[in-house]
Every structure is written in structure tokens, then in C-alpha cells.
Amino acid sequence: MTNSDRKEKLPGYFDSAWPVECGGNRRQKAATGKLLSKNSKTEMISTVSNKWNVMVIQREKNEFFLGGTMPYFNGPKPYGWVQKINSDSLEVLNESPQLPCGDHVWCGAIAAHENGSIIKVNGSFMHVLSPECEVIL
């Protein structure tokens, strides 16, 4: 039987509720806790960025990172990016520079490493960023 990724810390990842896209490598898309929305008022916040927003991950409590890419069909070469966002307002707090993809259009992957850095994969490139979205490697 397959273990549930939400019941134990995922080795290699930052110890948070959602350190990697889809909740883990097995893509179980499940987190611990409750939504507690039964008696709550529904509120939806949205924003338009004109980017291919792919996945949000959590590092520390209330510290969220959005990763994505720019699709390329004709025009400028594609690139990836990471934004540190405010989860209440969706305001961008920090943003990486354009991250090369190697001319390969793929939505990419994002994870919070156990050492605290953010790992972003785009096309044939892997980038390591600080929690302030600065490129380390």
C-alpha cells in the first residue's frame, strides 16, 4: 500500500504543509488539517498577471511562492519565474529575474528544499533561489 505523503515529513523537502507542487512526488494533492469552511463566509481573490501561473508552494507559515513560465509558441523565448506572494492579497512581494528554459516550453516544477532554498526547474535548467527570490545557482 502506498504511504500518504501528508502523514509524514517528506525527506529532502522543507517541513511545511505544502513544500512541493502537488503535495509531493506521488502527486497525491492532499494536505493535513481541515478547511473549516462550513460556517465561514466565502471570499475569492483573483488577479491577472498574463503569465502561466503553475503552482504555489508553502515554505514557512504564511510564506508562499508561485512558480510558472512564459509560454512560447512564436515570439520571445520562454523563461521561468518565481514570485513570493502575499496569500491574502496575492500581491507580489519579491520576484526572481527571468530564469532560462533552454528553448523548451514546459510549465516547470517548484519545491522548497529542506535547507530553505527554493528549487525551480524550467525546461532543461534547474535554478536555486533564496527565500527572497534571488538566484543562488
State where each predicted segment sits.
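Conserved beta-strand element within WD40/beta-propeller blades
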Residues: 66, 119-121
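Beta-strand-rich domains and repeat architectures in extracellular enzymes and scaffolds
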Residues: 4-81, 101-108
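A short loop-to-beta-strand structural motif that recurs across blades of beta-propeller domains
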Residues: 80-83, 125-127
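Short loop/turn segments that connect beta-strands within beta-propeller blades
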Residues: 86-89, 130-134
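A generic structural motif
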Residues: 98-99, 125
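Structural signature of WD-repeat beta-propellers
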Residues: 77, 121-123, 130
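A structural motif specific to WD40 beta-propellers
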Residues: 93-94, 136-137
